[in-house]
Amino acid sequence: MKRIWIQRIGAAVLCAVLLAGCMPGGPAADSTASADPLTGQEQQYPGQRPAAVVIDNAPGSTTQWGIGSASVVLEAAACADTAPSLCLVYPSVSAMPTVGPVTLGQDLFWRLLSGQQVLPIQRGCDLYTRNFLDYWNLRAVDALETGRNAFTTGNTDWASPLWCTN
């Protein structure tokens, strides 16, 4: 009999402890600054859409611009016989410096970043990438379409354009 009472008292104490843990505490610290979904740090460009640029990473490519200021750098080998491409992600278009050399867009990068609703920036794309962009009704800023309105080369070589926001 005494054992049953001890078990009941133990169960009641356990229930009280568990229910006390569910009660709302004091006032929580209200964070006014939202976190950047790319880095987790304080958001510097609230309400602006992230932008991502695919740049060439081949051994013979020209100097790469803008890598140091990117929030996220993705590297992936989309084709077996080519060098991996780099995808530089920035919190907004206004946060981007001159970036390049811009190269062929890869659907792998756009699939990875689709949850962030990034603005894709590329120089042409293959059939799979075009189908992905068309299916999700995404419009990439393409150097082959916009030309010198958004891109510069600094010389006559249009094969490796630089993204320029100024």
Residue spans of the language-model regions?
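Bacterial signal peptide processing site
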Residues: 23-26
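Bacterial N-terminal signal peptides that target proteins for export
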Residues: 2-13
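A surface/extracellular/periplasmic glyco- and lipid-processing/surface-interacting theme
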Residues: 29-74, 79-166
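C-terminal motif of bacterial Sec signal peptides marking the signal peptidase cleavage site
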Residues: 18-21
